[in-house]
């Protein structure tokens, strides 16, 4: 293998890496994907929601054959205190186009399927091998060193996940700071398909996506999530790494208390724990973006920090897919001119500007806005308090709605309400 020179070596068989391999192989490029896990997706952890638009135009109708779990039609956003919750519920009963849909997925299944599509197109995959170093010649990346073997390529695409050591060694990425990432933990809880559908009011392959703010992370930056799969639930939480030193609870204890919350416990009652996983999640958006392009090298997916936590929804997989496609298109263009210089590969950033970077730039101030203790303590308590007063009738004299809101608003502080409101308008 060391005698071959590939058009591209891709480090990592996640979504970005697999899509890059697929798009390249379809055009006849010689592609090698190196995955340190025993299979594609073996090392990947996600809450579990894939927005279909970025993959739909690469593999039209992919959901008909891919191992997607459920079509998300129900959205829930809950503000939680220790014992109560105020939930907003949206049900989409309208017919949507394939590119407007989203699905719950299990990465171990989905990533393996996607990599199979790339292999069928001609890409090569080796697993269980770690890339230790990138090979450079005259300042240009010309291959990788893996398991003591040097494998050469005209380009290398780094899709090796958040905190890419290889990108750091190249000087293209800085060491990840605690403020840039969060710790995510997830349990996969097995329940009968019919039970899931009854509890979440689903029909057929419909699914629900639920996000929770407040008590799941003990009032710290982050939140809980729950996604319905075919016969399992993906339940977990994410907490900003830089806040953990202030935490009164460990992350496992946060998760256990979240599971016992009155709004959550009935949903998972009787379920069987079949999997536990933990992962570091990029949270800083475009503010943690590395240098995306070098001589002979590109960075994509989580390795490039391509994740967006908007509070009401979380995006990462669709951005990774778009980045993988953009990287592949850039390499194909470079192959035509036999120019793999940094200047030529800069086309990659141009492709990204019409997708991931455009979206990430729009919300670049959001991470700092959300890194506000009131967002995960004061405001959930405000929402729950107003809801409690609204629905409580005890025979005492009635109180106007505005007075209920003002009374609870005092706890947050009216100056804080005004400041946060004005800042929210500029950010969102």
From Swiss-Prot:
Organism: Escherichia coli (strain K12)
Job of this protein: Could be part of an electron transfer system required for anaerobic carnitine reduction.
Keywords for this protein: Electron transport, FAD, Flavoprotein, Oxidoreductase, Transport
Gene this protein is translated from: fixC
Gene3D superfamilies: FAD/NAD(P)-binding domain
UniProt keyword Flavoprotein, yes or no: yes
GO molecular function, one term: oxidoreductase activity
InterPro entries the record matches: FAD-bd, FAD/NAD-bd_sf, FixC-like
One Pfam family here: FAD_binding_3
One GO process term, biological-process aspect: carnitine metabolic process
Protein name in the entry: Protein FixC
SUPFAM superfamilies: FAD-linked reductases, C-terminal domain, FAD/NAD(P)-binding domain
Family: Belongs to the ETF-QO/FixC family.
Cofactor: FAD
